[in-house]
Amino acid sequence: MDKALKEVFDYSYRDYILSWYGNLSRDEGQLYHLLLEDFWEIARQLHHRLSHVDVVKVVCNDVVRTLLTHFCDLKAANARHEEQPRPFVLHACLRNSDDEVRFLQTCSRVLVFCLLPSKDVQSLSLRIMLAEILTTKVLKPVVELLSNPDYINQMLLAQLAYREQMNEHHKRAYTYAPSYEDFIKLINSNSDVEFLKQLRYQIVVEIIQATTISSFPQLKRHKGKETAAMKADLLRARNMKRYINQLTVAKKQCEKRIRILGGPAYDQQEDGALDEGEGPQSQKILQFEDILANTFYREHFGMYMERMDKRALISFWESVEHLKNANKNEIPQLVGEIYQNFFVESKEISVEKSLYKEIQQCLVGNKGIEVFYKIQEDVYETLKDRYYPSFIVSDLYEKLLIKEEEKHASQMISNKDEMGPRDEAGEEAVDDGTNQINEQASFAVNKLRELNEKLEYKRQALNSIQNAPKPDKKIVSKLKDEIILIEKERTDLQLHMARTDWWCENLGMWKASITSGEVTEENGEQLPCYFVMVSLQEVGGVETKNWTVPRRLSEFQNLHRKLSECVPSLKKVQLPSLSKLPFKSIDQKFMEKSKNQLNKFLQNLLSDERLCQSEALYAFLSPSPDYLKVIDVQGKKNSFSLSSFLERLPRDFFSHQEEETEEDSDLSDYGDDVDGRKDALAEPCFMLIGEIFELRGMFKWVRRTLIALVQVTFGRTINKQIRDTVSWIFSEQMLVYYINIFRDAFWPNGKLAPPTTIRSKEQSQETKQRAQQKLLENIPDMLQSLVGQQNARHGIIKIFNALQETRANKHLLYALMELLLIELCPELRVHLDQLKAGQV
């Protein structure tokens, strides 16, 4: 950074100061050092102020909303004839040229006052002179240039031509070697710095392009069902992530080799980077999966992570691996330890609130340990994407390879320390066998066993938490309450099972009759309700078991409808119905008549040899809670099987778990998102995309697709990806890149660029047509897939046309300039308010 800034200062001093000052004085050396000292002080002041700017907010919210307002105003001003056009209100400084200059002078004076060294600020004449130079020689010409549609069109053509050229280059970028390892060897053995710099650039371009490529169709996962095409999409996404990782490794190797050969140090502050001359020229690349699977490799990787102060990531991954292979009775203790070590005491593994709630649910036994698998997968991706590329170019990796070679020299590598990859096919076979066994067993017995296990788990968890150094009182209290609920749930299930057994054992011997009825009021509406007594009359006429259930008339009608779907003859049976006349109350006569009709209906059902076996009838007469009963007579026209009744209960029926409202839960590395939403930062971007491409009804779909794309491609929330992208855009490496572009534009090959020639209207018109044609020919496939081909085309034309009006461009530039300068120098706001007040 310092070197790049120094070059710009030297060129500026040579061409803008020394060119005239050298003829007036021979003391240019002293002036150079004085100005250089002031230059560095200005740079420090600028850096200090920029460090207090919330760059993510400015870029993602303020700038994007300014662009959104600009396009909305342009759209309103260009309304169709049948609509009322709205005048496009320009920035206040664009009323006339004098107001424009005054605005720039005000900005320049505040900038000079804020950034000049304290010793120079005292001089009023110096401040005025520098502000005038900044206004007339820098800001005004820059605004005129950037708002000129012809210049914009020329830049568009140049960038598109450059992109086509680079596309041709990168097609040949990886034809140097037949395999990835050979490509790495080629980098490590090459001694041409310029070749390596060009190769590094091509790799960076490839990384940028690769991260934007993904399959948009079928990104959404359907619960419990995946199509072959969906699996292919996920496979492509996984391979793309591996490809990006390989590119990142190649880039690191390229930078290391350039540094060894005396070229620029692209990554000077990389911890653990090899010193010059270290390491073999040809290096073996261990795959990340192999490093984690091998204890010896993982130990060295853990040492590197400790150096990076991220040892907790490896420790968490290892703890979850241990949890996967633990005995059932060890799980509560291990879960408690993981919770205490990583989420309570150190909090080194930061997760979103939704995942944290799942962890607490797992801790108390309401959910399985799958949440830890999910977090482990995200930690795995973080280790692979962020730390693996730098690890394999570190001194610790070099030492690992040396030790590995020594082992090979003395003996064959022992497999005892190897932790082989999990046999997924074997697991699936075991799962299939287990599922078959479970299907053959009685579901009710299995569910009772699950409740007993859950109860035991919660008791162990309670004991583990109570014995912890810092027991969480809320969780302890919650566990005690849940243990009471599970005990009650178990009692209900046992009673339900016993009652079901009685029913099955005595089919055809049950009787049901309505003993009484009453009128209840619900939501201001009168409803008839009946009390049905169900009894079992054994031989000898002695009633041994009975119970009473309240049922509304609507429930009788639902039972009639369900049974009629299976037995069409029941449709002829008429049940009582309420009068549809308004304000007609339910009288005693109706209650008596309906009671008799319903009694007859029940007796007919129970006396029928087939209908008395109906699951729907048993569920209607059973006093068990609704969550213990599932009725599904659809599609079972003439078949009734009470034995399968309990087996068709959903497996999570007895778990009172909080439903998560968010579907895109993932590891945010890392911190909660703004406003508790995973796309809060992207909201203005979504609105801008919707406005430019006129999505209307497609807006929600595009929003979900973008979130899914970022999740699949980068393995993180869109908020996290936006933060990382903005941080990368304004990183030191990219700032150096921008400064070098500025330097090369003003001083190509170290010489001041000649003034541009004035172009004719014909030339400008030809450039405009070529630029529009090129833009339409180069619409990214990703954009067309996202918003549709026609919408993409119309949106590109809208953007292009918006840039063809000089005054509209100036308006946007001044709006953005005011926004950014106020963020940099808040003092400017008062001066601009005074200026606007004086113009009114």
Swiss-Prot record:
Question: Could you tell me which residue ranges the PXA domain spans?
Answer: 1-164
What positions are modified (Phosphoserine)? Answer: 665
- Spell out the coiled coil positions from the record: 434-499
Family annotation (InterPro entries): Phox_assoc, PX_dom, PX_dom_sf, RGS, RGS_sf, RGS_subdomain_2, SNX25_PX, Sorting_nexin_C
Q: Which Pfam families match?
A: Nexin_C, PX, PXA, RGS
Keyword Zinc found: no
Where the record annotates domain RGS, the positions are 287-401
Q: Where is the PX domain?
A: 508-628
- Respond yes or no to whether keyword Protein transport is given for this record: yes
Membrane topology according to the record: Peripheral membrane protein
> What does the UniProt keyword field contain?
Coiled coil, Endosome, Membrane, Phosphoprotein, Protein transport, Transport
Gene Ontology molecular function: phosphatidylinositol binding
The free-text function statement in the UniProt record for this protein reads: May be involved in several stages of intracellular trafficking.
PANTHER family hit by this protein = SORTING NEXIN, SORTING NEXIN-25
The entry sums up its family as follows: Belongs to the sorting nexin family.
**By what name is this protein known?**
Sorting nexin-25
Q: Which organism is it from?
A: Homo sapiens
